[in-house]
Amino acid sequence: MMTTSLIWGIAIAACCCLWLILGIRRRQTGEPPLENGLIPYLGCALQFGANPLEFLRANQRKHGHVFTCKLMGKYVHFITNPLSYHKVLCHGKYFDWKKFHFATSAKAFGHRSIDPMDGNTTENINDTFIKTLQGHALNSLTESMMENLQRIMRPPVSSNSKTAAWVTEGMYSFCYRVMFEAGYLTIFGRDLTRRDTQKAHILNNLDNFKQFDKVFPALVAGLPIHMFRTAHNAREKLAESLRHENLQKRESISELISLRMFLNDTLSTFDDLEKAKTHLVVLWASQANTIPATFWSLFQMIRNPEAMKAATEEVKRTLENAGQKVSLEGNPICLSQAELNDLPVLDSIIKESLRLSSASLNIRTAKEDFTLHLEDGSYNIRKDDIIALYPQLMHLDPEIYPDPLTFKYDRYLDENGKTKTTFYCNGLKLKYYYMPFGSGATICPGRLFAIHEIKQFLILMLSYFELELIEGQAKCPPLDQSRAGLGILPPLNDIEFKYKFKHL
């Protein structure tokens, strides 16, 4: 027994030595400082996952503005000086920004690769998104969202809820319920065969979405979904509801989904379920960050009396100028894109809310060995390494944003009450100072629609409802750090508020 134990001990020690000799990457001349971490494969992943912001700040103090960390078997070069961001983006010819995103999508949603290079489809999905989420297509999306929000938020004609007392509800739950239903109807249309049960069907999809989204960080980290039976079942049910045979029964489907259905049928070799799972990608992308962003915008506005007053006055003035009468029974509110774009106070409130809650990771994969030339030096990068920007470092930098942890509703307003676009670091004007939606080729193609959605929601909340936080609920809830790197962090706990219809 002792001999066997000794042999196993020697074998394990030998493996550890081999790993130390062969498995640890050595920093080469001209490369950034390197942190391999102590755990094989994981590297620094546990420290990064526990608190990305503090982990990166600590390495920034130790190594400077550029350093490399091993995370889940990948070598990630973090660029932390915001003055260098534009220089990084100038090296676009060396980057493959699609590789990581396509691989993550296939892993999380369960379809084959949607990268045209892999031969399963010839659709350029980014072009599809730009074509159907921006320009003229944005008009119909915006109009549909406003209509659906009011269908959900305004009382039915025969209802007595117009005179009801205060309703108390969790604010995050409220935002989740309203924005999910309105967004679902806007993107995927209304079911012609389920008029009576449509709301129940959407709420069932909402529950499945929550179950799936709960494990999404683990899926991105590389864990197989079969480890999470409930989430796997929820994902498959969501996909079933998005099969083409089901979508064809719906009316007022967005141009995005109509075009994607056509391109899936004509340009791909996906089976019916895989096609549905590519639509599930759209559902997740349209909801997962918009919902928490809506919550933070509403919460920060309500808890700040000055913000509430300024926003209410701006909305009232805009509606009057547009000739819109606010009524629970009359015509619904309708604002054009131009009118939505001319709301600097709401825009600043949303930007400030996202600045405080966004934790996105902007990444690109090196297609070949190359030299990265930045403001503070040049660095050799190896093929298949990852270049990463973590904008939360910039968003919470006191030199760029004084008193960075405090919500200031007018932070993005200039002295004339217009949108402020000038921010400085080390006395130099920043080209990139606000990046919750990514940057360059990886910038979110649906960002304009997302901002419109949140503005529309806030306009309707201010127009139709009296709003108050429950006593003792004004303290800002902590951010859920488990989703760091994925976008907008939701609150770790919900906040109770109360609302009732105004006497209009």
UniProtKB/Swiss-Prot annotation:
Coiled-coil blocks: none
Topology in membrane: Single-pass membrane protein
Biological process according to GO: bile acid and bile salt transport; bile acid biosynthetic process; cellular response to cholesterol; cellular response to glucose stimulus; cholesterol catabolic process; cholesterol homeostasis; negative regulation of collagen biosynthetic process; negative regulation of fatty acid biosynthetic process
Tissue-by-tissue expression: Detected in liver.
Transmembrane segments: 4-24
The protein's annotated pathway: Lipid metabolism; bile acid biosynthesis; Steroid metabolism; cholesterol degradation
Pfam name, any one: p450
Annotated EC: 1.14.14.26, 1.14.14.23
This protein's record includes keyword Ion transport: no
Binding-site list for heme: C444
Domain of life of the native organism: Eukaryota
Catalytically driven reaction(s): cholesterol + reduced [NADPH--hemoprotein reductase] + O2 = 7alpha-hydroxycholesterol + oxidized [NADPH--hemoprotein reductase] + H2O + H(+); 4beta-hydroxycholesterol + reduced [NADPH--hemoprotein reductase] + O2 = 4beta,7alpha-dihydroxycholesterol + oxidized [NADPH--hemoprotein reductase] + H2O + H(+); lathosterol + reduced [NADPH--hemoprotein reductase] + O2 = 7alpha,8alpha-epoxy-5alpha-cholestan-3beta-ol + oxidized [NADPH--hemoprotein reductase] + H2O + H(+); lathosterol + reduced [NADPH--hemoprotein reductase] + O2 = 5alpha-cholestan-7-oxo-3beta-ol + oxidized [NADPH--hemoprotein reductase] + H2O + H(+)
Induction: Up-regulated by glucose and by cholestyramine. Down-regulated by chenodeoxycholic acid.
Main location: endoplasmic reticulum
Protein location: Endoplasmic reticulum membrane; Microsome membrane
Entry cofactors: heme
InterPro entries: Cholesterol_7a_monooxygenase (IPR030681), CYP450_sterol_14alpha_dmase (IPR050529), Cyt_P450 (IPR001128), Cyt_P450_CS (IPR017972), Cyt_P450_CYP7A1-type (IPR024204), Cyt_P450_E_grp-IV (IPR002403), Cyt_P450_sf (IPR036396)
GO CC, alphabetical: endoplasmic reticulum membrane; intracellular membrane-bounded organelle
Keyword NAD recorded: no
GO molecular function: 24S-hydroxycholesterol 7-alpha-hydroxylase activity; cholesterol 7-alpha-monooxygenase activity; heme binding; iron ion binding
Family: Belongs to the cytochrome P450 family.
Annotated protein name in UniProt: Cytochrome P450 7A1
Annotated organism of origin: Homo sapiens (Human)
